[in-house]
A protein has these predicted regions:
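Acidic catalytic loop of the alpha/beta-hydrolase fold
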Residues: 255-259
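Conserved hydrolase catalytic core segment
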Residues: 135-173
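Active-site loop/oxyanion-hole signature of alpha/beta-hydrolase fold enzymes
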Residues: 48-51, 58-61, 93, 100-140
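Conserved HGGG/HGGXW glycine-rich cap/lid loop of the alpha/beta-hydrolase fold
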Residues: 60-108
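Catalytic active-site module of serine/aspartate enzymes centered on a nucleophile-bearing elbow/loop
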Residues: 274-275, 281-320
Length: 320
């Protein structure tokens, strides 16, 4: 009986500790769950020295042991490699050797005190490709990552075989939110940011809101410096994007309130032979919120022989 009581006490203590960890650091707990899911799916977490800094990245290979077609996924502003979690295992299973870096200043990569900007992150992505000895690959970018992917396709076209842009920051447009909105300081400003990112935002518990605001307080300076670069619009690709010659897929959430679908349509118009797919019911976070149609369009495009050329399609959104 005493032994049972001791075991029960230990279990209760562990439950209290686990509950306390989740309450005080829910974002960390969520990250561990995502990383465990990726690990179970055969996705490896790695580090590499690139451009003088330590960068974290995920790597996944086809389960059949084949080399796989190299595919690099580049995340957006304020994001990290984990944001591709809904797509990485499926892309590897489809025959791709997937590399997913955390850009400089984000995720588990180094966060040096430097003047963050779009060109700096492009150089960081190129340094990553050099560090892992990847001469060329299919390259996909989401939001700010789309700018980086498109810029690489223009500046070093031999490095990009096929290009995929998801709700991408490619052309000039009038922002729907203020410059400082990406670094919320209270519940009201966080609610406004979430409402712009997702057409159907979920209500967050108070302890999750507080943890999220603490994270923005710690790392928001990187986002703000990058936003300073973005809002000048001096690095917009309007005058260059028509020079992209790689087969290009453009995927857009039809309800994107951050970068309106009109930007995607204009990008499609400007890139010769590009394929445009809009996903109904999805917003700026389409690859994460609606991974099934986004994955289907991506895999079909990247595996097509000969490469797909031109065309438009609308897909129904399928939320997780």
């Amino acid at each position: 009986m005493k032994s049972f009581s001791r075991i029960s006490g230990v279990i209760l203590l562990l439950a209290l500790i686990a509950g306390g960890i989740f309450y005080w650091n829910p974002l960390w707990v969520n990250d561990q769950q995502i990383r465990y899911h990726l690990w179970r799916a055969g996705v490896h977490s790695e580090y590499v020295e690139a451009g003088g800094y330590r960068l974290h990245y995920f790597e996944a290979t086809p389960p059949d042991g084949s080399p796989g077609t190299p595919l690099v996924l580049i995340h957006g502003l304020g994001a990290r490699g984990e944001d591709w979690a809904a797509m990485i295992p499926s892309l590897a299973a489809a025959g791709f050797h997937v590399y997913v870096p955390d850009l400089l200043g984000f995720g588990r990569s180094a966060r040096p005190d430097v003047p963050y900007s779009l060109p700096l992150e492009e150089n960081d992505a190129l340094a990553f490709l050099d560090a892992i000895h990847l001469q060329h690959a299919d390259v996909a970018g989401w939001s700010m990552g789309g700018w980086i992917a498109a810029a690489i396709a223009l500046d070093q076209p031999q490095r990009v075989d096929r290009l995929v842009l998801y709700d991408s920051l490619t052309l000039k447009f009038d922002p729907t939110i203020a410059q400082d909105a990406f670094v919320p300081t209270d519940k009201a400003s966080l609610d406004r940011l979430i409402a712009v990112l997702s057409p159907r935002p979920r209500a967050l518990p108070g302890f999750v809101i507080r943890a999220t605001l603490r994270k923005f307080h710690r790392t928001g300076w990187v986002i703000q410096r990058t936003m300073d670069s973005i809002f000048t619009k001096k690095d917009a690709l309007d005058d260059r994007i028509a020079a992209i010659r790689q087969p290009t897929l453009i995927v857009w959430g039809a309800e994107d309130r951050l970068i309106p679908i009109a930007v995607g349509e204009a990008t499609h118009h400007d890139i010769p032979g590009s394929v445009f797919v809009s996903v109904q019911g999805c917003g700026h976070l389409a690859p994460g919120e609606c991974p099934k149609p986004v994955l289907a369009a991506t895999i079909e495009f990247l595996k097509a022989q000969p490469p797909m050329h031109g065309g438009e399609e609308t897909l129904p959104g399928v939320t997780k």
